[in-house]
Amino acid sequence: MIDKKVIVIGAGLAGSEAAWQVANAGVPVKLVEMRPFKSTPAHHTGEFGELVCSNSFGALNPDRAAGLLQKELRIFKSLIIQTADKFAVPAGGALAVDRSKFSMALTEALSSHPLIEIERFEQLDLPRKEKITILATGPLTSDELSYKIQAFTGIDACHFFDAASPIIYGDSIDQEIVFKASRYDKGDPAYLNCPMDKNNYIHFRNQLIEGEQANLKDFEKESANFFEACLPIEEIARRGVDTMRFGPLKSIGLWNPKWGDLFDRENRLKKRPYAIVQLRKEDLEGKLLNMVGFQTNLKWSEQKRIFRMIPGLEKAEFVRFGVMHRNTFLESPNLLLPTLQFMKRNNLFAAGQITGTEGYAAAAAGGLLAGINASLLAKGKKTVSFPKESMIGSLINFISNKNQILSNQKKNKFQPMPASFGLVPELTKRIKDKRLRYKAYQERSTEALNDFKNKLDYCFEKDHLLSKIY
């Protein structure tokens, strides 16, 4: 028999949101947080929802992906976004918060809720099968619990480091310069290729070597063996003038028919590029493209500057920059349903960064959905998934859809993803102007979510509780 009391493990953004949604649906919650009795290398307090990196939730304008995600969360009265709005600080067009007041307010809100029981200890194992549980332990999940999650999901389904190449929008690439081809013409032309001559390559390599690095935290530096197994592109460049050319930038076997006869040796030697950067589809439609082999520890501003030196990428727009850091996350497409339930245990949910989403608002969105569904399950009702036309729905669909991991990609190549318009379904009518297209995405999302919200057998009217807190 299922215990109707929901357990939420982790009181970060996702866990805090999940606990709030469950409790406000009238279902009792036990919220487990190990801090401050056991901290992480990145946290400094025992407050809930402590922001350890930036204090920004991203752009406010709903014509931007991050802004639309925030707008959708406001529709569902997200605790995280309402608290962020309450303690916002001036940040131009972004939503940034006073970190201390933000986390203290979250802690007070959750601690004073009559249906939320707070327990401070390190969860060492997954709760028993009869317990409805939301796993929201984040990228710095404790070692002991990580081992138990790994045992439950399978050794290849739980990752402990994030080595991700940049992802760029396909429509920002110069199609006059790049060309489609697979190496040695094997199969369909699965890659877009950016050819470099010798001068391009030498200049590019020099800039990579001189580029400013992001600072690794001490606990990340201790994991040097990881970086040896998956070297940053700038480290490959340092190892020799031609090292990249015989690695991720090798040009052999790639040919553009515009260059003439491949089998004419003289022509081939004359026209063959000195090096080639390859771009691979990140989604089935090819709206998002991954820079193959470009995991990097360069600062984001440097990535933008240096990678735009690649022919064809002069005006590239980045969905996500490359990262190399400690990050516990699941191989979610092989584990989770669009409801955020585990396929092999339907009363166990996952939410937040551990599912492979990136960003504060995305973590809150995962907590929102997991909380709604855990409360529905506790009441004996059917769980739900958000419409794909919404930013929340498209992001959750990406991390829970096996088809998003393309057949031409190697096993376990799923990488965390932020909110992006590249994830949402195409409009029925094509709109060339980007601003108008993004506005249309926003309008479609709002309509779909309002309809979805009206149909949900769930109470969202909680203003009386918020007013007591603030």
Swiss-Prot record:
Encoding gene, per UniProt annotation: trmFO
Protein name: Methylenetetrahydrofolate--tRNA-(uracil-5-)-methyltransferase TrmFO
Function: Catalyzes the folate-dependent formation of 5-methyl-uridine at position 54 (M-5-U54) in all tRNAs.
Cysteines joined through disulfide linkages: none
Transmembrane segments: none
InterPro entries registered for this protein in UniProt: FAD/NAD-bd_sf, MnmG-rel, MnmG-rel_CS, MnmG_N, TrmFO
Catalytic activity: uridine(54) in tRNA + (6R)-5,10-methylene-5,6,7,8-tetrahydrofolate + NADH + H(+) = 5-methyluridine(54) in tRNA + (6S)-5,6,7,8-tetrahydrofolate + NAD(+); uridine(54) in tRNA + (6R)-5,10-methylene-5,6,7,8-tetrahydrofolate + NADPH + H(+) = 5-methyluridine(54) in tRNA + (6S)-5,6,7,8-tetrahydrofolate + NADP(+)
One Gene Ontology term of the molecular function aspect: flavin adenine dinucleotide binding
First-level EC class: transferase
A cellular component term, taken from the record's GO annotations: cytosol
Keywords, in A-Z order: Cytoplasm, FAD, Flavoprotein, Methyltransferase, NAD, NADP, Transferase, tRNA processing
Cofactor: FAD
Organism: Prochlorococcus marinus (strain MIT 9215)
